[in-house]
Amino acid sequence: MAHRAQVGLQDATSPIMEELVIFHDHALMIIFLICFLVLYALFLTLTTKLTNTNISDAQEMETIWTTLPAIILILIALPSLRILYLTDEINDPSFTIKSIGHQWYWTYEYTDYGGLIFNSYMLPPLFLEPGDLRLLDVDNRVVLPVEAPVRMMITSQDVLHSWTVPSLGLKTDAIPGRLNQTTFTATRPGVYYGQCSEICGANHSFMPIVLELIPLKIFEMGPVFAL
């Protein structure tokens, strides 16, 4: 989960997020290398006294500054495309949950477990208990099992929303009249927080998402659905 004054990414809780963290470090290394080369070239240009104004052709240099950017783009694009296809892959989910965005709360439907439906509202400051997070905790959490593929069907009843949980590497738009889907497999139990990531009106900042991930054996016992 996130911490105060956190600079880096949140701890990965799914294979997709682990891939995203690795790709982030990979792309950042390439960017640092490009910046270093550009600054080094500028430094040499400003400090050298060896100049030649009669050069009209530099075939080798033109080849290098055409080929090198193409190679760099390929090194960035290939891992990115791989992750993009992984995020769209549907791996025989164990069960399906439907999430419906409203102004400004979420509705969840456990269609595979007796059609359980409930709303999830942000807890007002007066109802927070010690240890709860302001603007992030909700009255009804989404309880999910770890190490089981889950398919989340996402839509909206009014305006554009976006169902986002950074620790799982999830961000899927909720669009009225359209049903989007995403799959994920959590690897660690715990409580993980997200928020609507699409500006959806005056209370856009007040529709958090809370996932409580528990072992599969406990999840299948049933009482976890007592909200």
Curated annotation (Swiss-Prot):
<dbReference type="InterPro" id="IPR034210">
    <property type="entry name" value="CcO_II_C"/>
</dbReference>
<dbReference type="InterPro" id="IPR011759">
    <property type="entry name" value="Cyt_c_oxidase_su2_TM_dom"/>
</dbReference>
<keyword id="KW-0812">Transmembrane</keyword>
<feature type="binding site">
    <location>
        <position position="198"/>
    </location>
    <ligand>
        <name>Cu cation A2</name>
    </ligand>
</feature>
<feature type="topological domain" description="Mitochondrial intermembrane">
    <location>
        <begin position="88"/>
        <end position="227"/>
    </location>
</feature>
<feature type="binding site">
    <location>
        <position position="200"/>
    </location>
    <ligand>
        <name>Cu cation A1</name>
    </ligand>
</feature>
<keyword id="KW-1133">Transmembrane helix</keyword>
<keyword id="KW-0496">Mitochondrion</keyword>
<dbReference type="GO" id="GO:0005739">
    <property type="term" value="C:mitochondrion"/>
</dbReference>
<dbReference type="Pfam" id="PF02790">
    <property type="entry name" value="COX2_TM"/>
</dbReference>
<dbReference type="GO" id="GO:0004129">
    <property type="term" value="F:cytochrome-c oxidase activity"/>
</dbReference>
<feature type="binding site">
    <location>
        <position position="161"/>
    </location>
    <ligand>
        <name>Cu cation A1</name>
    </ligand>
</feature>
<keyword id="KW-0679">Respiratory chain</keyword>
<comment type="function">
    <text>Component of the cytochrome c oxidase, the last enzyme in the mitochondrial electron transport chain which drives oxidative phosphorylation. The respiratory chain contains 3 multisubunit complexes succinate dehydrogenase (complex II, CII), ubiquinol-cytochrome c oxidoreductase (cytochrome b-c1 complex, complex III, CIII) and cytochrome c oxidase (complex IV, CIV), that cooperate to transfer electrons derived from NADH and succinate to molecular oxygen, creating an electrochemical gradient over the inner membrane that drives transmembrane transport and the ATP synthase.</text>
</comment>
<feature type="binding site">
    <location>
        <position position="200"/>
    </location>
    <ligand>
        <name>Cu cation A2</name>
    </ligand>
</feature>
<keyword id="KW-0249">Electron transport</keyword>
<protein>
    <recommendedName>
        <fullName>Cytochrome c oxidase subunit 2</fullName>
        <ecNumber>7.1.1.9</ecNumber>
    </recommendedName>
</protein>
<feature type="binding site">
    <location>
        <position position="196"/>
    </location>
    <ligand>
        <name>Cu cation A1</name>
    </ligand>
</feature>
<dbReference type="InterPro" id="IPR001505">
    <property type="entry name" value="Copper_CuA"/>
</dbReference>
<feature type="topological domain" description="Mitochondrial intermembrane">
    <location>
        <begin position="1"/>
        <end position="14"/>
    </location>
</feature>
<keyword id="KW-0472">Membrane</keyword>
<dbReference type="InterPro" id="IPR036257">
    <property type="entry name" value="Cyt_c_oxidase_su2_TM_sf"/>
</dbReference>
<feature type="transmembrane region" description="Helical; Name=I">
    <location>
        <begin position="15"/>
        <end position="45"/>
    </location>
</feature>
<dbReference type="InterPro" id="IPR045187">
    <property type="entry name" value="CcO_II"/>
</dbReference>
<dbReference type="GO" id="GO:0005743">
    <property type="term" value="C:mitochondrial inner membrane"/>
</dbReference>
<feature type="topological domain" description="Mitochondrial matrix">
    <location>
        <begin position="46"/>
        <end position="59"/>
    </location>
</feature>
<comment type="similarity">
    <text>Belongs to the cytochrome c oxidase subunit 2 family.</text>
</comment>
<feature type="binding site">
    <location>
        <position position="198"/>
    </location>
    <ligand>
        <name>Mg(2+)</name>
    </ligand>
</feature>
<dbReference type="InterPro" id="IPR002429">
    <property type="entry name" value="CcO_II-like_C"/>
</dbReference>
<dbReference type="GO" id="GO:0045277">
    <property type="term" value="C:respiratory chain complex IV"/>
</dbReference>
<keyword id="KW-0186">Copper</keyword>
<dbReference type="GO" id="GO:0005507">
    <property type="term" value="F:copper ion binding"/>
</dbReference>
<dbReference type="GO" id="GO:0042773">
    <property type="term" value="P:ATP synthesis coupled electron transport"/>
</dbReference>
<keyword id="KW-0999">Mitochondrion inner membrane</keyword>
<dbReference type="Pfam" id="PF00116">
    <property type="entry name" value="COX2"/>
</dbReference>
<feature type="transmembrane region" description="Helical; Name=II">
    <location>
        <begin position="60"/>
        <end position="87"/>
    </location>
</feature>
<keyword id="KW-0813">Transport</keyword>
<keyword id="KW-0460">Magnesium</keyword>
<keyword id="KW-1278">Translocase</keyword>
<dbReference type="InterPro" id="IPR014222">
    <property type="entry name" value="Cyt_c_oxidase_su2"/>
</dbReference>
<keyword id="KW-0479">Metal-binding</keyword>
<feature type="binding site">
    <location>
        <position position="207"/>
    </location>
    <ligand>
        <name>Cu cation A1</name>
    </ligand>
</feature>
